[in-house]
Regions:
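Conserved thiamine diphosphate
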Residues: 14-19, 23-26, 83-97, 102-116, ...
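Short alpha-helical segments and helix-capping/turn motifs at coil-helix boundaries
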Residues: 3, 32-43, 162-163, 187-193, ...
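Beta-sheet entry/capping signal
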Residues: 20, 46-51, 56-59, 175-177, ...
Length: 397
């Protein structure tokens, strides 16, 4: 058995070895969403807090009487709760604020213990070390293993130790995740999402982008691209997709990434790790093929569909890391290679949501597909311009 600390190191690809703490979900076969949720549980599951929007992800994550979330051998696992469709981000922010408040109480009690005469010197050293490293997840895990037996042994004699023992669940730095689909994130819950990232708090938002309201039957959302047939866009959507990620970068202090696991597993893993490590709000937009897309190859090929989407330019991979700007580097990193644009139309025709336009509205299909390709090229060229900007020169001035 591989030791979890070894697996967690950068020398290993942890997602290949760590035990998933999200398993056997009731999602559709080939669902493009669940691999991302599973990966996050492998990386941070033993200290993960999840605020889940209502939608597909809440159904397969919490259908009574079962849940795919589980625990490791120590009894640690994700803490999951579901909120309404429109306020999932605020719900997650509330979790984070409550956690901050309780940890601030821990700091207060530990400082009082350090200043008192009731605690031995070795206790005070460990308390001081925890205060100095309270935002370091791995260090707090290590220190929690020392602190818990110490305070449990002394709690009957020392009131400070008793208070710390009562708050021991807050010793390890938690990883706060907010999970929802594109309907919740781009549309109904967008105001809340914007409010939460503007707060500057250390939360991680995962948008499972299926480009439709999946759970309610495939209605059009602001994430639905030009030309796709969906409910409320029966003749093919006529306006371009909202660029939620690029909008979030305008704050300048939000970590943002667009990922597609089937296209680039390394980039997906790197983006998720960077987002969680970033000491502020992060937004990850993950491309997720859905049964509503009508993949002609079948949902068993959903990972391959993600790869095709990136290669033809339908979906783009990039990361925006504000920490790089502090080093005088360009925070925007374009991870997609130059697309094979000649494959773009073929990709559209491989999904029923686009192919249906050709059957039902042949006169308009060519125009819509051309517009979809032009929009994709326009967006990719915009990303290329952002990636080329000379941040070193700006910093030197």
């Amino acid at each position: 058995e591989i030791h979890e600390r070894l697996v967690g190191s950068e020398m290993c690809i942890r997602d290949r070895f760590a035990t998933p703490l999200f398993e056997f979900s009731g999602a559709c076969s080939g669902c493009g969403e669940t691999p991302y949720v599973k990966l996050i549980s492998q990386l941070f599951g033993d200290r993960e807090m999840v605020a889940n929007a209502t939608g597909c992800s809440s159904i397969y994550s919490g259908s009574v009487p079962s849940t795919p979330y589980t625990m490791n051998e120590k009894g640690h696992g994700p803490a999951w709760a579901n909120s309404l469709f429109e306020d999932f981000c605020e719900f997650g922010l509330g979790m984070e604020l409550a956690n901050e408040k309780m940890r601030a109480r821990l700091v207060k009690v530990m400082n009082e213990a350090i200043a008192s005469d009731c605690c031995p010197a070795e206790y005070k050293e460990v308390f001081a070390e925890w205060i100095n490293n309270m935002l370091d997840a791995e260090k707090t895990k290590e220190l929690a293993e020392k602190i818990i037996p110490m305070v449990e042994a002394a709690k009957d004699k020392c009131n400070h130790c008793k208070q710390i023992a009562d708050l021991q669940q807050y010793l390890v730095k938690r990883s706060q995740w907010i999970i929802g689909g594109d309907g919740a994130s781009y549309d109904i819950g967008y105001g809340g999402l914007d409010h939460v990232i503007a707060s500057g708090k250390d939360v991680n938002i995962l948008v499972l982008d299926t480009e439709v309201y999946s759970n309610t039957g495939g209605q059009s959302s602001k994430a639905t691209p030009v030309g796709a047939i969906a409910k409320f866009a029966a003749a093919g959507k006529r306006v371009r997709k909202k660029d939620l990620g690029l909008m979030a970068t305008t704050y300048g202090y939000v970590y943002v990434a667009q990922i597609a696991m089937g296209a680039d597993q390394a980039q997906t893993l790197k983006a998720i790790r960077e987002a969680e490590a970033y000491p502020g709000p992060s937004l990850i937009i993950a491309y997720a093929p859905c049964i509503n897309h009508g993949l002609k190859a079948g949902m068993g090929k959903s990972q391959e569909e993600e790869e095709k989407a990136v290669k033809c330019g339908y979906w783009h991979l990039w990361r925006y890391n504000p920490a790089l700007e502090e080093e005088g580097k360009n925070p925007f990193q374009l991870d997609s290679k130059e697309p094979n644009w000649e494959d773009f139309q073929g990709f559209l025709k491989g999904e029923v949501r686009y192919a249906s336009v050709m059957k039902q509205y042949p006169a308009e299909a060519e125009e819509l597909f051309k517009a979809a390709e032009e929009n994709a090229k326009w967006r990719y060229n915009s990303y290329k311009r952002l990636a080329r900007e000379n941040w070193g020169a700006d910093t030197a001035e």
